[in-house]
Amino acid sequence: MPWSFSASRRFVLQPNHAGWVFPHQCQQRKLWDALTGDELHSFEHKHIVRACAFSEDTNLLLTGGVEKILRIFDLNRPDAPPREVDNSPSSIRTVAWLHSDQTILSSCTDIGGVRLWDVRSGKIVQTLETKSPVTSAEVSQDGRYITTADGSTVKFWDANHFGLVKSYNMPCNVESASLEPKFGNKFIAGGEDMWVHLFDFHTGEEIGCNKGHHGPVHCVRFSPGGESYASGSEDGTVRIWQTGPANNDENDTQNSGNGPTGKVKVAADEVTRKIEGFHIGKEGKSGEKDKAADA
């Protein structure tokens, strides 16, 4: 289950789940300042919340969970009652925004498919059919593709015409998948085998594999620039992996706006002390497929 960051990376939302993440706060969504770790607001719900997403303009917050209700909070008026769309066919597993915040997509915990909702009417306008429940749904940075994970399959859909573009079978049941945002030429997937797999987008060939987690991988996401990606596991750690060769030129690193893999420019200890339950694991080291297999 992913943490959700605003587009500016300034705000972060805490995911809550009654089973394994934050059982004592399973009916809330908390909003933090990602630079300081200060809690800004808490959004109360009546039951477990499983998914959240910022709108593209970061003014709206979308949540969904066991109540089968999609809620839209206005972050400029956080204490105001949210708008509700309450006709989801089952408990909500994932949510995302599409088409410049005019469309919402969601999936359910025990029903296959991804449903697309018109924000103005609150009605379903399209369904992307899958055999298994969709555990992960991501809209690509350029808005062209919707990436979904269901069962042991990763699928890519046209985000405008909603046709299936590519479908690849994975080596295990996968919980999450993410498309590289800059070039769109590779994607990552993680699941029950505790590994983070790297694949060629055009062929589906596995080109890399990362070991290090000691529990199933529940979420994977690329950084906005694609130079690294993060994985969150049931083992309680978040690991950050480098996509390509390390850049040893410190000046280039500073100009790129990205620090070394697995390290944070701000005082991580201070931020994580304030944000209960957030842990950064030891620096992840990426390996080629053949090297990982021999390990």
Where are these regions (language model features)?
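Loop/turn segments within WD40 beta-propeller blades
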Residues: 12-18, 53-58, 96-102, 138-143, ...
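Conserved strand-to-loop turn within each blade of WD40 beta-propeller repeats
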Residues: 23-26, 64-67, 107-111, 148-151, ...
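A structural motif specific to WD40 beta-propellers
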Residues: 38-41, 80-83, 125-126, 165-166, ...
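Solenoidal tandem-repeat scaffolds enriched in leucines and small polar residues
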Residues: 48-131, 135-137
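WD40-repeat beta-propellers
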Residues: 29-32, 52, 70-74, 114-118, ...
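WD40/WD-repeat beta-propeller blade N-cap
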Residues: 2-8, 43-49, 85-92, 128-134, ...
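Terminal intrinsically disordered, low-complexity extensions flanking WD-repeat/beta-propeller proteins
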Residues: 173, 203-209, 214-218, 223-228, ...
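Hydrophobic beta-strand positions that form the internal "hydrophobic ladder"
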Residues: 20-22, 61, 104-105, 146, ...
